[in-house]
Amino acid sequence: MPTRARTLFLLATLSAACGGGPTSPGGGPSATPTPPGSPVSGFLFYDENSNGIADGGELVRLPSVGVSIGGQTGTTTTGGRFSLPSVPNGAQTAQARAETLPAYFTSPGVSVSVPPGGDVPVPARLALGARVRPNVYLAFGDSITFGTGSSDEEGYVDDLRAQLRSFWGRADMVNDGEPATRSSAGEARIAGSLGQSRAAYALILYGTNDWNEPECRSEFPCYTVDALRSMVQDTRSAGAHPIVGTIPPVNPNYADRNATERNDWVRRMNDLIRQMAAQERAQVAEVHGDFLKQPSLPALFDDFLHPNDQGYALMSQSFFRAITQPLPGAAATMDDAGPILFVPPGTRP
């Protein structure tokens, strides 16, 4: 190759290696143009039958959950609604962010063309057994679950129902509190209770009465944690989801009933219950921790063991948070199913 031709070839090669190409009027490389975007609004709904369509009877909406479309994210508000001001035009996937979904929910995503021409319904799913009734909650435990000590004898159940209906739009409660029972009795009867109620969630609160068993004091932790683990597993076998309540403390004003010793036993047992729940990937309602955060523990009790109305209201908040908030350490993985096709309002596939 002649010397001049070789020189020109080398200069061209160096120019390409150093980023030679389109330049801006000022001499530098031109910026990649930002794709045009459009506003997108919609809502996050509980897709009870997993068909990807917001059917007329599917009334539950999920507030306080992150939604992502085309790399743009927002958080749902009342009624599960979201609004993103500028989403890149074209084919995108709309999906709830897994780490923000309530415990046990998943989001398969929905394919949507931007601009969509209407509200985008984004589905969230909850895997349930074939006979299980969506939005039904089984309160399962002893006399504290039964409601002893509350003025209406309903305990936390009515208040929790009202909170869930206000937040999500639908909830029904079944109370199966059996006074004076221990966790071993709960283990024996939970399968039958779930079979009869066909509940989607079991709100398990057991262990208070185990203290009365000499074995549970002398051979700690006796059968309590194993019985609770069995209840968690039986709940899943029934196609439902477990919420495990930590054991509430007792009223410290009853010193003549070994309140200090008993509350230490409760604290140690709850440490093991939390560990078990983490191993089983079960959501925890932090009843014990929420009680201890209050300025006056005795003010929450009707007697030595049973909460009063104020205490039960606090318990309903503990269970409400457990149901509606993410599972600790929720993985960022979504449902294995790929994106489903967004069907515009008023049409069906």
What role is predicted for each listed range?
Residues V40-Y46, G80:
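A short, amphipathic beta-strand motif
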Residues I53-A54, R61, S68-R81:
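Short, acidic Ser/Thr/Gly-rich low-complexity loop/linker segments typical of extracellular
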Residues P88-A103:
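A short, solvent-exposed beta-strand micro-motif common in secreted/extracellular proteins
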Residues E99-P123:
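Structured interaction patches on ligand/partner-binding surfaces of diverse proteins
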Residues L126-G177, A191-R198:
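Serine-esterase "nucleophile elbow" of acetyl-processing enzymes
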Residues L160, S184-V225, P248-V250:
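Oxyanion-hole/transition-state-stabilizing segment in secreted/luminal serine hydrolases
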Residues L205-N209, V232-R267:
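Active-site segments of SGNH/GDSL-like serine hydrolases
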Residues P249-P349:
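Catalytic His-Asp segment of secreted/periplasmic serine-dependent ester chemistry enzymes
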